[in-house]
Amino acid sequence: ETMPSFKHSLILSSLKDSYILGFDHWYKRYYSFYHPHDECLKEHMSTRAIEILKHIYGEGKFSTNYDLHLPVDVEDKIKEFIGDTRIVIINPLGAKKICRLTFEQIKVIYQEVKTHFENYRIIFTGLPQDLLTIPILEIETLPFDEFIYTVALTKYSDFVISVDTALVHIAAAYHKPTLAFYPNSRTPEYPSHLIWSPNHHKSIQIVSPTYTVKDIDTETLTNSVKRLSCIDKK
């Protein structure tokens, strides 16, 4: 759903590879082979990986499971940070405006988590400057700035609540029970909430009735947190 970019064109035209497989119709002329998979896409984006593997190896069964590498020192720091505590991650403010919960919604989710996840440690993740704006006293955040530490925290967490699809898919890589809030798609021709859905059986996906997550009502928020608490709770 991105518009063509001259800068992107320059990057593609400067590639020295002898063969380029591409999916974006805006840049057809820069590819050795254009694949129409993404045209009128109505299924999860992971199916694109299958098409790439088919193109290279021919027909067959392929795994599209996520595989994330973590540096040992990063994992060690996170394990020391969390100790033997049980963790619920809340990621309430995404990079896009349409993926940012209101402060009232954040408070509702936070209170519900405290109610249904007693004795769990609640850690907020996101951009440091965004987390500073949340009007909840003494919320806990990571003491590390690099995103790789959030990835490691996700690996060692117990539950994840997120508006950020990147974190949703990281949680899926580690098979973490996840509550994911999505804006509705702007057009039926590109059902983004389906294409970029959690793609994991331990995930609960809540799709807003509008193009922004701020319109998800309080009852839906509270019920969804309650549902999350029933998944693999220790």
Model-identified regions with their sequence ranges:
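Catalytic machinery of carbohydrate-active enzymes
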Residues: E1-K234
